[in-house]
Amino acid sequence: MAQYIPDPQFGSETFEVILQRMMDRIQQRDKREGAVIWDSNASSAIELQLIYLALDDILIESFGDSASREFLIRRAAERGIIPFPATHAILRGEFTPVDVDVTGRRFSMPNTALTYIVEDKIEDGAYQVRCEQLGSEGNHFLGSIVPILGGNPRIQTAELVELLIPAQDVESTESIRQRYFDSFNVRAMGGNIRDYQVMVREIEGTGPVRVTPIWNGGGTVLLTLLDYLYNPASPVLVDRVQEIIDPTGDHKGVGRAPIGHQVTVQSANILDVNISTELTFLGGFNWEMVQPQVTSLMEAYMMELRQDWQNQDILSPLGFFQNPLIVMVSQINSRLLGVQGIIDIQNTTLNGVAANLEIDIYSIPMLGAIST
C-alpha cells in the first residue's frame, strides 16, 4: 500500500502568525519592528514555529500509514514484523567432467561483478551454486562461469543453467507497511490459514502460497507454492519449505506445523494460455509491427494474474473459499485495443474456446502462442 501523506496539522502556525499573536497580547508599548519588544518576541516566535513543525513530523511518524521507513520498522516490530533481508540466489551449476568434485570452489561470471560458491551436490556433475552477492541481481545471469584463482585444473566446463531459488532485495517500505496492516485483519496463530501464509513467506525465495486445509482428510494441509518471482517453485525450493514446515509428516509437530497437522508442499502447475484473435489494422500497420508490444502486454497480464493468485483464497464471514483465476477475453481485447495501429478485434479465443478461461486453483497462467 502507498504511504499516506497527511496535510500539516499546524501549517497555519507560521512565524508571522505566532509573532502577531504575541504582539496582540502586549498593549500600549512600542511594538514596531526593531523595537526591543518586537526583537525579543521575534526570536521566541521562530523557535515556536520550529516546535510546531516538529509536532507535525511527530504526528506523521506516529502512524503506520504515514510513517517513513525508519519509524515504520519500529512500529511494525511491535507486531512482530521484521523487514525481510536481502538473500542470495541459488542456481544449478553443471560441470564437466562429471566425476570432478567442485564443492566449495569459487567461480565468477565474466563481464559482471558476480561471484559464486559451489555448495550441495544434486547429482553427478550438477551442484547447487550460491551467488555470493546479496540481492536480485544474482537472478538475472545464466551461462558459463570461470574458476577464481585456485580452481581445480581438471574442470573443463562450468555453467549456470537454472535459477533454483530466486534472491530477493531488502523488503520495500510499502511491503512492510502492507504486512503491518494485514496483521490486524486476520491473526496468524495455531496453524490457521494466515499462519501458514506467514510462515511460508518467511522462507527465503518463496512467493505466494495457496493453503488448502483438510485436502486429504482431517489434519492434512496442502501448500501450493510460487517462488519470489511468481514462477512455479523449483523442486529444491519445495523440498526446503517441506523440511522447515513438516519434515516428518507424522502429525507430531517436528517442524513449524502445529501438532496434529500433516503438511504436503507442492509447486503450482503451469497452464499455457494460447491466444487466437483476428485484428484489423490501421493503414500502414501490420502484425509484425505490433507483435512485440502485443506480446509484452499479454505477458504483463499473465503476470498480474499470477501476482493475484494467492488473493483468490478468500476468508469471509461465510467461510473459506478458494476461487480460480480467470483469464478474461474482455481484458485481452481492451489491452489490445490500446496498441497503436490496432483498430478492431474479433473472434478472440483462449486455448481454442471463445470464452473466458478458468484456471484450476493449483495452476498459474503462462503466455503460450499468440496467433492472428
Predicted regions and their residues:
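N-terminal polar alpha-helical/low-complexity "assembly arms" that mediate subunit docking
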Residues: M1-R201, P258, N286-T372
